[in-house]
Design a protein with these regions (language model features):
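Catalytic-core regions of core metabolic enzymes
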Residues: 1-653
Length: 653
């Protein structure tokens, strides 16, 4: 691969059993190479890896690709060996790609290196690709002759013992030759650090990720494949969306999106025109546009007037514009130019189905002549021999799409990136860690109050009373009241009827005490204390919660609260590295958010205190690394636009 791809640098094969390999002089050992070595590619039996790496490091080799498999991915013994190798590499200040990888490719003329065991010759492009799976790499390279995929850099990372997605993300962001960054990942090596790169606005280029392991079974398979820690796919979905990272559903989507960013300008909006010579494919394209949340552009009167002068009377000047099968290449070009000139149009999908009497090749070439600042995507559905001729065009050819639905997804991804790419200010830590070392499991009410005071969390005034000593003098609140039974063992008080609300007298308070005590006894739970609170009649009940994900770190949630929270599942989740826009999205993306706007004559709820609570909660879990989860549920929204956190659980580790 190195030789046939045209690498012009020096190559030193090392193998004690050969004198020459493919015309290159072969050396019996690393030590016998009488030259500096910039890059070492190691493909030796696993038993020889540690020794070979040692020789390379002794020779001051700073970059190593370890292709050999049989490390972390096969179990504990392999994991231990991988760690030993990594330790040596780190101590020497070198970097390692792999192990269990396929190698790397650099297509740019100043390097021109294919250091993989796949002999394909990818064309030079401005897309970088990083894959955790060597088999996916091989599959992608094996399909190059059937696709328009072009690469600048191509990395098979394997187990990511050292070089991982974070390293390459930063490297490619700074590389002016690279325009689009793509990943196939089965795990995130340092997920929280990955997100911080976006939270600090260090990454500006479009990033597209295909994540293997969506289902529980898929996550398990990915873990056994890579030996890496998995995470819930809902968390992956949430964080990628939050930071403007495009998520592909398959390889076709991944590289279609990359082609879009590499070859076309970003759409200014979401209004799309479809031009076709066949009705069916246009309908499929329109369905895909609507599914992706895009709009079918309303063509202006002047545009329709111009189109009527060109299009056959039985064709259509409405969007989608239909030239019928007899539309000639020059006519196709003119129609595309007219529609692109319409101020109501942000992007155009041009679909050409090749009839016997009109050449697809000529139609494509004519449309390629168009100069426009708007994205113009061509779908071509030609006779089979077209693709053979097309692949012989020079490297500057514009990419084509084969399915009428594909451009809709590309436009949707580009519009998503366009909306998310602007600079935003994200939350940072506010305080140093509060000392929670003496706390185990769920925090005590006293410690909860300390946190609440520190972060301005509006917990409703509460009084902790030992069982058996409730009397008129111990209650500082006016009626009505709420009485709760408290125990660290009890997660959901309502499940055992341990909450009594709207208590209007001392007699009702005593009865509530007896009822709660009886409920604890029935359920074999130890009642530690009673909690007395003022009763606030709710207008709405919301939830604000959070947890520390093992991969991506602190997460926060907002949604409908109360005892039916799991049933309604009306929750929006994001990383705790929030921007003000993220907080607005959290509220707006829930059904509760719709209710808070006011429905059926109700007045809208003032959202400023809710936004502040979400922000304070995020800061709390960002600052305090021992907090593993917290749950403010319910948070009562009163009729006079006040909020009260009436039930709190905070767990530490």
């Amino acid at each position: 691969s190195i030789k046939t791809y045209g690498y012009k640098g020096k190559v030193f094969p090392v193998n004690p059993k050969a004198d020459k390999i493919l015309g290159y002089k072969c050396y019996p050992s690393v030590d016998s190479v009488n030259s500096d070595i910039d890059l070492a590619i190691v493909a030796v039996p696993k038993i020889s890896v540690e020794e070979t790496i040692g020789h390379l490091l002794a020779k001051k080799v700073s970059s190593i690709i370890l292709i050999t498999a049989g490390f972390k991915e096969v179990g504990e013994a392999g994991k231990e060996l991988e760690y030993k190798v990594l330790l040596k590499v780190k101590e020497a200040g070198a970097r390692l790609v792999g192990p269990n990888c396929m190698g790397v490719i650099n297509t740019f003329e100043d390097v021109k290196l294919n250091a993989t065991f796949v002999a394909e010759k990818p064309e030079t492009g401005r897309t970088a690709f990083f894959s955790q799976s060597g088999a996916v790499c091989a599959a992608v390279l094996n399909t190059l002759r059937e696709t328009d995929i072009k690469f600048g850099h191509f990395i098979s990372a394997g187990n990511k013992a050292d070089v991982c997605e974070n390293d390459m993300l930063l490297f490619w962001e700074k590389d002016s030759k690279i325009k689009t960054i793509t990943f196939y990942l089965e795990s995130f090596e340092k997920g929280e650090e990955f997100l911080k790169l976006f939270a600090r606005n260090e990454i500006k280029k479009p990033v597209i990720i295909l994540k293997g392991g969506r289902s529980a079974t898929g996550i398990k398979a990915a873990q056994s494949h890579t030996g890496a820690l998995g995470t819930n796919d809902k968390v992956v979905e949430a964080v990628l969306d939050q930071f403007g990272i495009i998520r592909a559903n398959n390889l076709n989507e991944l590289f279609n999106a990359a082609k879009g960013f590499e070859n076309f300008p970003l759409p200014a909006g979401n209004r799309v025109a479809v031009i076709t010579n066949g009705g069916g494919p246009a309908i499929l394209a329109v369905d895909a546009l609507i599914k992706e949340g895009l709009k079918l552009a309303e063509l202006s009167g002047s545009t329709k007037k111009k189109l009527k002068e060109i299009i056959h009377p039985e064709g259509s000047t409405e969007n989608p514009v239909d030239l019928l099968p007899g539309g000639a290449p020059e006519q196709f070009k003119t129609v595309n130019e007219i529609v692109l000139g319409d101020n109501n149009v942000d992007a155009v999908i041009s679909i050409f189905v090749e009839p016997v009497m009109v050449s697809a090749e000529e139609a494509v070439k004519k449309i390629n002549e168009i100069k426009t600042s708007k994205p113009l995507f061509q779908t071509v559905m030609p006779l089979p021999e077209f693709w053979t001729r097309y692949r012989k065009w020079d490297n500057s050819r514009k990419p084509l799409f084969r399915n009428p639905e594909d451009p809709a997804k590309v436009i949707s991804n580009m519009f998503f990136y366009q909306q998310k790419k602007d600079h935003r200010t994200f939350l940072k830590s506010k305080f140093s860690d509060l000392d929670l070392s003496g706390e185990k499991g769920f925090l005590s009410p006293k410690m909860i109050n300390s946190l609440a005071e520190r972060y301005g969390i509006p917990i409703i005034p509460s009084l902790l009373i030992k069982r058996g000593i409730i009397n008129k003098s111990t209650n500082p609140f006016t009626y009505p009241l709420v009485l709760k039974g408290y125990s660290k063992e009890l997660i959901h008080k309502s499940e055992i009827d341990a909450v009594k609300i709207d208590i209007k007298s001392f007699e009702e308070l005593l009865q509530a005490e007896m009822d709660i005590l009886e409920s604890f006894n029935k359920n074999n739970l130890i009642l530690e204390d009673f909690l007395v609170q003022p009763y606030i009649k709710p207008k709405h009940e919301i939830l604000v919660g959070g947890f520390r994900d093992p991969v991506f770190g602190p997460m926060v949630m907002f949604g409908s609260g109360g005892k039916y929270v799991e049933i309604f599942n009306d929750i929006c989740m994001k990383s705790a590295y929030l921007s003000d826009k993220d907080i607005e999205e959290m509220i707006n993306r829930t059904k509760m958010g719709e209710l808070l706007k006011g429905v059926r004559g109700e007045s809208p709820f003032e959202l400023s205190e809710i936004k502040e609570l979400i922000k304070s909660s995020a800061r709390m879990i960002l600052d305090n690394h021992s907090i593993t989860e917290f749950d403010f549920n319910p948070v009562i929204l009163s009729k006079n636009d006040q909020i009260f956190v009436v039930d709190v659980r905070i767990k530490t580790n």
